[in-house]
Design a protein with these regions (language model features):
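Active-site phosphate-binding strand-loop segment of PLP-dependent enzymes
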Residues: 1-58, 64-66
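PLP-dependent aminotransferase class I/II
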Residues: 4-13, 17, 33, 68-178
């Protein structure tokens, strides 16, 4: 969440032992990396979102599935075309991205590294400014290159959280921890 990546080696091994596909949800981690390994390169396939609140936004959302597995790629293509292959043996959807949306995303991708550097610099300023306050700021982990999709702070004290939320017209992104 929020651009963080975690070590998934135990989960990957669990999936591999049981012949379960490891699908990497990288919707909020585009541009992030952990120990030089980029988000979206870990799973059997990975998914990214281009919704309006993501690092790269399309004009009407959308997303992409990445894989280097030919069978997974074939199956994803079938599902996005109403389940059509030679016959309709799979439930599918009309999940094709409009060309205009794809072109806008393509152009925005060209600025991703620069925008990420700016978000990281702002996050460092926030970390310094909030250092002496009774809040929990995003953790800085060795080896993590965080895209800072969101800069999330937590309050230990609920009354302080309520006062700050009201004063700043802030919101709680996820009400209950996952």
């Amino acid at each position: 969440l929020f651009g963080y990546m975690e070590d998934t080696s135990v989960l990957q091994a669990f999936c591999k032992e049981r012949n379960i596909l490891f699908i990497e949800d990288a919707a909020q981690a585009l541009g992030s990396s952990l120990n030089g390994v980029h988000a979206g390169t870990i799973g059997d396939c990975s998914v990214f979102s281009f919704n309006s609140n993501k690092v790269i936004a399309g004009i009407n959302g959308g997303g992409v599935v990445l894989t280097d597995d030919d069978e997974i790629a074939k199956r994803v293509k079938q599902i996005r075309r109403h389940g059509k292959d030679k016959t309709f043996d799979t439930l599918g959807y009309n999940s094709r991205m409009y060309v205009l949306n794809a072109r806008i995303i393509e152009q925005r991708m060209k600025h991703m590294e620069d925008n990420q550097s700016k978000r990281q610099a702002i996050a460092q300023q926030y970390n310094q400014a909030f250092a002496d306050l009774p809040i929990v700021t995003p953790k800085v982990t060795n080896g993590l290159n965080n895209n800072y999709h969101k800069y999330v702070i937590r309050f230990e004290d609920k009354d302080t959280r309520k006062r700050v939320k009201k004063a700043l017209n802030a919101s709680i992104h996820y009400e209950t921890p996952l």
